[in-house]
Regions:
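Terminal peptide-recognition signature
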Residues: 4, 23, 49, 61, ...
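N-terminal Rossmann-like NAD(P) cofactor-binding module of classical short-chain dehydrogenase/reductase
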Residues: 32, 47-50, 72
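Short, polar loop motifs at secondary-structure junctions
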Residues: 15-19, 37, 55-56, 76-78
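A short acidic, Gly/Pro-enriched loop at the edge of an enzyme's catalytic core
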Residues: 40-48
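Mid-domain Rossmann-like dinucleotide-binding core that forms the NAD(H)/NADP(H) cofactor-binding site
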Residues: 1-33
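C-terminal hydrophobic helical "lid"/dimerization subdomain
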Residues: 107-158
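Short acidic-hydrophobic, aromatic-tinged amphipathic segments that line or gate anion-handling sites
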Residues: 30-34, 131-134
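Glycine-rich phosphate-binding loop and adjacent beta-alpha segment
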Residues: 52-122, 156-158
Length: 158
């Protein structure tokens, strides 16, 4: 979201009620509470959908994509990853809509740009909680339940 904003995008964040304020603080122009509104049926269309949760079928978002829109799966459940791998390319051949996956490949220029954005204060990490290694199971449980607001960090030593 923060990177999209630096590129001039109008950003709509989709999150639960508990995370709305954080999403706004990261620069979202619009915030949709998925517990009250379904972005797949609300009539809005988007040029790009970045799906970091992958809690529902990839293709549920078809009607939310603009005619030449791009759906990008960024992590999530293995079931959705397989769905994208097997059907994304085939589905992309129909019409102008594209379905793809994002796989990060660290490279020096991109990392330098991220460091520059952090130095400028344009990009900031959101750390919601820190857990010592001895409490890693609790940290994972919080993430699995979707209760984490920001990143959960496991500290190995102080």
């Amino acid at each position: 979201m923060q990177i999209a904003k630096t590129m001039g995008a109008t950003v709509t964040g989709v999150c639960s009620t508990a995370k709305m304020e954080m999403v706004r603080s990261l620069g979202a122009d619009h915030v949709v509470d998925y517990t009250k509104d379904d972005v797949t049926t609300n009539g809005e269309t988007y040029d790009v959908i970045l799906d970091a949760g992958a809690y529902r079928s990839t293709f549920d978002y078809t009607r939310s994509l603009a005619p030449t829109g791009v759906y990008v799966l960024v992590g999530g459940e293995m079931k959705r990853t397989w769905q994208m791998l097997l059907l994304g390319r085939l589905r992309s051949k129909k019409g102008g809509k594209q379905y793809t996956m994002f796989v990060a490949r660290a490279n020096r220029p991109d990392l330098a740009k991220l460091a520059e954005l952090m130095d400028q204060g344009t990009l900031r990490p959101v750390i919601g909680a820190r857990y010592p290694l001895a409490h890693a199971a609790e940290a994972v449980s919080i993430m699995e339940q979707g209760k984490a607001v920001g990143k959960v960090v496991i500290t190995v030593s102080e």
